[in-house]
Regions:
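Bacterial N-terminal signal peptides that target proteins for export
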Residues: 2-14
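Bacterial N-terminal signal peptides
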Residues: 13-24
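A short, acidic, amphipathic alpha-helical segment used as a generic capping/interface helix at domain edges
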Residues: 136-146
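Active-site-proximal alpha-helix that buttresses catalytic centers in soluble enzyme cores
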Residues: 30-118, 123-127, 132, 168-196
């Protein structure tokens, strides 16, 4: 009796696991479809960059003065690009923050030329810019979706920018597929963990 109840419990757990895996796979397999409907963008936090913040006196025109991708971060960005290809995203309009770790992440995705836009630049060191930067990002998103409605749009930025825009905290290399309303603001989202 105890063995039979244990088997039934195990069968139920396994059935729920299979259903969950199928639903997750279906959600991932359909990534290319929403990204070409003129309503979605894929925001990505730059890949792994060891350390915290940028060194004092860093300059955007000198990567050597910034916190940059480590070897793991470079591989993480490449694996993310391969994963996107498996989801049907072979090319995209790719936008990046001016910070080198973001530009390098965007470049290593290998989805097309990288368009550097200050709207995606970090305000971590000056939080008083949060509203201004978030509004700039909203305008960039709205303009890009109007300009490229049938082209996947990928934007590589920083955790503070993405959190301010979506309300979601992402880890290094994580992505968030965001459905955008007519006003350029997020309606819904789905998070995709970074490649490990």
């Amino acid at each position: 009796m105890v063995i039979r109840a244990g088997c039934q419990f195990f069968q139920r757990v396994m059935a729920m696991l299979v259903i969950t895996l199928c639903l997750s796979t279906a959600a991932v397999a359909n990534l290319a479809s929403p990204m070409t409907d003129g309503q979605h963008i894929l925001l990505m936090r730059h890949a792994d960059a060891p350390g915290f913040s940028d060194p004092a006196g860093h300059r955007l025109d000198q990567c050597s003065t910034q916190r940059n991708l480590g070897e793991f971060g470079k591989k993480q960005a490449e694996r993310t690009g391969q994963w996107l290809s498996q989801q049907g995203i072979e090319s995209a309009k790719v936008f990046s923050s001016p910070w080198c770790r973001c530009v390098d992440t965007a470049t290593l995705l290998k989805k097309g030329p990288v368009i550097v836009d200050p709207s995606l630049g970090s305000f971590f060191e000056n939080m008083s810019l949060a509203n201004q930067k978030t509004e700039s990002l909203r305008q960039l998103v709205q303009k890009s979706l109007k300009q490229f409605p049938k082209t996947p749009i990928i934007m590589v930025s920083h955790h503070v920018n993405i959190e301010a825009f979506t309300g979601v905290v992402l880890g290094s290399g994580d992505m968030i597929l965001v459905k955008i309303g007519p006003n350029g603001k997020p309606i819904s989202h789905q998070v995709f963990p970074g490649m490990r």
